[in-house]
From Swiss-Prot:
GO terms for cellular component: nucleus. It is found in: Nucleus. Residues 139-198 bind DNA. One of its GO terms (molecular function) is RNA polymerase II cis-regulatory region sequence-specific DNA binding. PROSITE patterns: ANTENNAPEDIA, HOMEOBOX_1, HOMEOBOX_2. It comes from Bos taurus. The gene is HOXA2. This is Homeobox protein Hox-A2. InterPro entries: HD, HD_metazoa, Homeobox_Antennapedia_CS, Homeobox_CS, Homeodomain-like_sf.
Length: 372
């Protein structure tokens, strides 16, 4: 008893090896092998072996020695395994998570044989397409093929109206032999296409504008540089022209002065003497009256104009200035030298103090010229 108890404890606690199982238990009958071969030939499904208790007699409660003779008698293996197993018993139970979601792929097939029930459903491509077409919501909707006339009419309508109201949509669908949904979907897709095209154009235009702005800025900078350079050149040219013009004027004036000095120097010594002599004669002999003074002033002015030549008017020399100053001073002395009663008769009002100062200065100037 102790040996058997230890053997049972060791068998339960530790898994026995394959050799130990084969030596300790009697061999399996050939009927099981033959029945299993027959069932495997009948069906292509996975083989379901009998329970583990039936294969091992030691685990079978009827064959254990402790149960004695009161246990169930061992059934005959030939009678139990000779008859084929029904198809319903071999089919596994169907659980909710094993059910397919789409009703389109469910095929109701009659359970004629175990192979047709358990094996994979082999359908042709045409049958699968028919099943997919038959199911409305499960399959993907086919793409609509529009004709050229339909596309032309839709494009014309989109050109005038980007959005359609429902009456117009129904009208177009009736005219083009389309459904209202097809017209609506086409307009939605066409609006998205139009949006993409406009965005691309805007991006290209913005890039072009940016490039044009950069080019215009560069052109403006170049023009500014050119304008500054041209202004500098023009200023320098103007300065050079001015310098050349002034140099030419100076040269011409020097030439004219030299020519006038050489040509007119012979006549000048005579003319001042004649004018001075005339002035002195008038100053000595004539009485200091206003009419005489005016006559002498007219004569002196005429003599002065006669003495001045056109060459002397254009380029006056130092001698001309001296002659003019002496003549004018003499003429003024002749005009101012009369007494106070004669000068008071003149229309110009002059005070006595200013008149005395003016006569004193003129007499001093006349004396200086007379000394020469």
């Amino acid at each position: 008893m102790n040996y058997e108890f230890e053997r049972e404890i060791g068998f339960i606690n530790s898994q026995p090896s394959l050799a130990e199982c084969l030596t300790s238990f009697p061999p399996v009958a050939d009927t099981f092998q033959s029945s299993s071969i027959k069932t495997s030939t009948l069906s292509h499904s996975t083989l379901i072996p009998p329970p583990f208790e039936q294969t091992i007699p030691s685990l079978n409660p009827g064959s254990h020695p402790r149960h004695g003779a009161g246990g169930r008698p061992k059934p005959s293996p030939a009678g139990s395994r000779g008859s084929p197993v029904p198809a319903g018993a071999l089919q596994p139970p169907e659980y909710p998570w094993m059910k397919e979601k789409k009703a389109a792929k469910k095929t109701v097939l009659p359970p004629a044989s175990a192979a047709s029930a358990t094996g994979p459903a082999c359908l042709s491509h045409k049958e699968s397409l028919e099943i997919a077409d038959g199911s409305g919501g499960g399959s993907r909707r086919l793409r609509t093929a529009y004709t050229n006339t339909q596309l032309l009419e839709l494009e014309k309508e989109f050109h005038f109206n980007k959005y359609l109201c429902r009456p117009r949509r129904v009208e177009i669908a009736a005219l083009l032999d389309l459904t209202e949904r097809q017209v609506k979907v086409w307009f939605q897709n066409r609006r998205m296409k139009h949006k993409r095209q406009t965005q691309c154009k805007e991006n290209q235009n913005s890039e072009g504008k940016f490039k044009s702005l950069e080019d215009s800025e560069k052109v403006d900078e170049d023009e500014e540089e050119k304008s500054l350079f041209e202004q500098a050149l023009s200023v320098s040219g103007a300065l050079l022209e001015r310098e050349g013009y002034t140099f030419q004027q100076n040269a011409l004036s020097q030439q004219q002065a030299s020519n006038g000095y050489n040509g007119d120097s012979q006549s000048f010594p005579v003319s001042p003497l004649t004018s001075n002599e005339k002035n002195l004669k008038h100053f000595q002999h004539q009485s200091p009256t206003v009419p005489n003074c005016l006559s002498t002033m007219g004569q002196n002015c005429g003599s002065g104009l006669n003495n001045d030549s056109p060459e002397a008017l254009e380029v006056p020399s130092l001698q001309d200035f001296n002659v003019f100053s002496t003549d004018s001073c003499l003429q003024l002395s002749d005009a101012v030298s009369p007494s106070l009663p004669g000068s008071l008769d003149s229309p110009v009002d002059i005070s006595a103090d200013s008149f005395d100062f003016f006569t004193d200065t003129l007499t001093t100037i006349d004396l200086q010229h007379l000394n020469y």
